[in-house]
Every structure is written in structure tokens, then in C-alpha cells.
Design a protein with these regions (language model features):
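A glycine- and Lys/Arg-enriched "phosphate-lid" helix/loop adjacent to the NTP-binding pocket
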Residues: 143-220
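Post-Walker A alpha-helix
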Residues: 49-50, 54
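Hydrophobic anchor at the beta1->P-loop junction of P-loop NTPases
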Residues: 38
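P-loop (Walker A) phosphate-binding loop of NTP-binding proteins
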Residues: 41
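Conserved lysine of the Walker
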Residues: 46
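Conserved substrate/cofactor phosphate-moiety recognition/catalytic segment
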Residues: 55-105, 148
């Protein structure tokens, strides 16, 4: 069972080959490799925390959140996807018309994250003994925090939520992603809202504090409730 640990609020500011099932998609099969997911609210300081970790040791490798895919921006080393060729900033579309785009965004966010987290590790990482790979969020928070919050707030219908849960469970059973631990960057909703305004990401300028409060409650329930189990 993966370990969970919470980090208190600090001063943080703001063509690769896919591994085939035959190679066991769970890359923790690499000897000595540890896989840790860093979780937290929007603007909790995850990117800064991960950058500091990466700079602190050559044994640390970071898989960042694929947000550029959601913004329709071609990031270095990635090919342009069919959705990008069609145009559209899906992150912005979700924030502007959440009920219309909730299912589309939550589906694509999870699938793009899954793709990023299943890429074959660089040789220098895979060959290094006792290395650790840190992930900016996981497919578990995609479901248990963001998608579930959309359902609870009425942005996802019962039918959409049931379909989401069905394919999400199937993918995790078919493409196992084991995590050895979860690090939770616990930050107050007010602080994350202030940081979000400060960093000035255009899509986030109208995000309400109440939305961050709801996400905070979901993180607390998932990561700090000892009775809760990942499904």
C-alpha cells in the first residue's frame, strides 16, 4: 500500500517510446526505482517543490503535469495531437463553460497524464540505482479530486460519471501504475487563490475561491482520511 505524507504550508511560490504491456507498464519494475506522486490544490506549489527536488539530486527525475497539452501548446519533444490540430484551449474552454466541457476536459486530462506517466524512462534514469521518479499529480487525483468534484457539483451527470469511473478503473487494471508514496502539499484555499492570481495564468483569472475550497476538501478526504481507500 502506498504511503501518504502531508507537507505543511511553506514558502513555495508558485518522441519517446511508450512501454508495451509485455514490458510491464508499471515502470517500478526497474530495480530500485521509487515512484512518488506529489499532490495538492491548484497553485499549492507543486511545480516549485518538484523543481527544487530535481535540483537537489541527480537521482531525482520529475514528470510534470501535461498542462501544455490542455492549453493547445506544442511542448518540446511532443508531437502535435489530433485535438491540437483542431485547435482550442481545452483548459480555458472548461473554465468558461464548465458544464459543457467538464467531461471532455476531465477525460483528456486523465488520458494525457496517463500517457505522460507511462513513457519509457530515459536511460540515465532507468540505469541509475536507487533513483526516484516524482509525478506532478496522478491519475488517482484526476478521479478522486477533480472528476468527483465535477460530479458532486453537477457539472458531470450521473451517466457521465459512471462512464468515467468505468473506463478509469479499466485502464488502471490494464495499465498498472504503482506509487510507493504520495506527498501532499497542504495549503489553505485562500493562499492557493492568491498565488493563482499572482502567477497570472490567463485561463485561471476567473476561478472562484469556492472552487478551490471544494478541491481542498476533496484532497483532505482522499489523502488524510484514514478510512478512505483508493478505488
Amino acid at each position: 500500500m502506498a504511503k501518504r505524507c502531508a507537507a505543511g504550508e511553506g514558502e513555495l511560490q508558485g518522441n519517446e517510446e511508450m512501454i508495451s504491456p509485455a514490458k510491464k507498464l508499471c515502470t517500478s519494475a526497474v530495480s530500485g526505482l521509487r515512484r512518488i506522486a506529489v499532490e495538492g490544490n491548484i497553485a499549492a506549489g507543486k511545480s516549485t517543490f518538484l523543481r527544487l527536488l530535481k535540483e537537489s539530486s541527480p537521482a531525482y527525475h520529475v514528470i510534470s503535469e501535461p498542462i501544455t497539452k490542455w492549453q493547445n501548446v506544442d511542448s518540446p519533444g511532443d508531437s502535435v495531437t489530433a485535438s491540437q490540430q483542431c485547435g482550442g484551449n481545452l483548459l480555458d474552454m472548461f473554465y468558461r463553460e464548465p458544464k459543457r466541457w467538464a467531461y471532455t476536459f476531465q477525460t483528456y486530462a486523465c488520458l494525457s497524464r496517463l500517457k505522460a506517466q507511462l513513457r519509457q524512462l530515459p536511460q540515465e534514469v532507468a540505469s541509475q540505482p536507487n533513483s526516484t521518479i516524482f509525478f506532478e499529480r496522478s491519475v488517482h487525483s484526476d478521479k478522486l479530486v477533480f472528476a468527483e468534484n465535477c460530479h458532486d457539483s453537477g457539472l458531470l451527470s450521473d451517466v457521465e460519471w459512471n462512464i468515467y469511473c468505468d473506463w478509469h478503473s479499466f485502464l488502471l487494471e490494464s495499465l498498472p501504475l504503482h506509487f510507493d508514496a504520495f506527498i501532499y502539499l497542504k495549503t489553505t484555499p485562500q493562499t492557493t487563490w492568491e498565488r493563482m492570481q499572482k502567477r497570472g495564468r490567463p485561463e485561471e483569472q476567473d476561478v472562484a475561491l469556492d472552487y478551490l475550497k471544494s478541491l481542498h476538501e476533496k484532497h483532505e478526504k482522499w489523502l488524510l482520511d484514514s478510512e478512505n481507500k483508493m478505488k
